[in-house]
């Protein structure tokens, strides 16, 4: 039996050991949804062309479900693994343009970039949906005692 392929595979495996990103580095890295990076020359977030449009909010809600946003942000965007998107506490800014940028380019610490999968119009409709959500009546706060 020829053991050369096995020896070669083990050698390559040993040579690659230790080159994996640390858990911290993987956590801080930007992640591209579906492995597809946003295209070069991506649009700058400006004014939301769908702001306040109810039908666009409905389409954005559909995108929220189809793209599995609720898998991290919970049903109705109330928060789960990812933060709540309806309590007014925006980590990277809560303006339409800032939310667009977060969805399009992603953010370190777990928010994938969807600019490679979704066209800008779909992202704006998702922003419209998120901005249409009412904040919960009982926003939990942290006690500093």
Could you say what each language-model-derived stretch is?
Residues 2-8:
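Sec-dependent signal peptide recognition
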Residues 69-72:
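Short cysteine clusters
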Residues 76, 107, 133-137:
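A general structural signal marking secondary-structure boundaries and capping sites
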């Amino acid at each position: 039996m020829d053991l050369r392929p096995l020896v070669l595979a083990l050698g390559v495996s040993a040579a690659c050991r230790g080159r994996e990103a640390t858990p911290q580095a993987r956590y801080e890295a930007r992640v591209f949804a579906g492995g597809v990076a946003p295209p070069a020359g991506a649009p700058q977030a400006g004014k939301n062309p769908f702001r306040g449009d109810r039908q666009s909010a409905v389409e954005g809600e559909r995108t929220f479900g189809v793209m599995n946003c609720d898998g991290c942000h919970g049903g109705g965007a109330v928060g789960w693994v990812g933060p709540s998107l309806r309590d007014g506490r925006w980590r990277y800014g809560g303006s339409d343009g800032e939310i667009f940028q977060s969805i399009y380019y992603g953010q370190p610490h777990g928010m994938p970039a969807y600019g490679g999968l979704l066209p800008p119009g779909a992202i704006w409709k998702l922003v419209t949906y998120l901005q249409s959500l009412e904040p919960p009546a009982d926003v939990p706060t942290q006690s500093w005692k």
